[in-house]
Regions:
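Short strand-coil-strand connectors
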Residues: 70-71, 117, 158
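Active-site environment of divalent metal-dependent phosphoester hydrolases
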Residues: 10-15, 36-41, 55-60, 82-87, ...
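A short, polar/proline- and glycine-enriched secondary-structure boundary/capping micro-motif
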Residues: 15-16, 85-89, 133, 161-169
Length: 173
């Protein structure tokens, strides 16, 4: 199973279209972690399972998404309602409550990934307004490949190229 995660494009339609066009057919699902600032009816949003972010005023997206793909339970939130700037504990509790195998979030504009008690926690970073150590990449998103043994996480830059230093493999055991 392969899932693509993107977040915080803040109205940048072009980058979402490029990502969708490039990876359509290569991934099983595309998840958007919020702050798209685009209407759900916008054609560019159609490939993405999207949640509402703190700057998505008046847009009709859910607060959470739970997608089941090839027996993997993928939970997506924006993060602002779960204090992800300070701790992952509320998100971890929500992930366990939903029996998620992957919990993805945005909001911080900084990529992050870790595996805790068999659950992968992933922030794809902001595709349009990155912050922190990897800001120089101009934006990031991630593709997670999952099999029975491991989570394989590859981050990509804004030019849709894999970032060699941002490839992580986590055992599911």
């Amino acid at each position: 199973m392969k899932a693509l995660f993107v977040s915080d494009n803040h109205g940048d339609r072009d980058i979402l279209q490029k990502i969708a066009d490039r990876f359509k057919g290569e991934v099983n699902v595309m998840m958007h972690c919020g702050d798209s600032n685009l209407e759900p009816s916008d054609p560019v949003m159609q490939p993405f399972n999207t949640v509402i972010g703190n700057t998505d005023w008046g847009l009709n997206y859910p607060k959470t998404q739970l997608a089941v793909v090839d027996h993997e339970r993928i939970l997506v939130v924006h993060g602002h309602l779960y204090q992800v700037n300070f701790t992952l504990t509320p998100l971890m509790l929500l992930a366990k409550e939903n029996r998620a195998t992957i919990a993805a979030y945005g909001h911080t504009h900084q990529l992050a990934v870790e595996c805790n008690q068999g659950i992968l926690y992933l922030n794809p970073g902001s595709i349009s307004q990155p912050r922190g150590q990897y800001q120089k990449l101009g934006g990031t998103f991630a593709i997670v490949s999952v099999d029975a043994d491991q989570f394989d996480v590859q981050y990509y830059d804004r030019s849709l190229q894999p970032v060699d230093d941002l490839h992580f493999v986590f055992s599911r055991q």
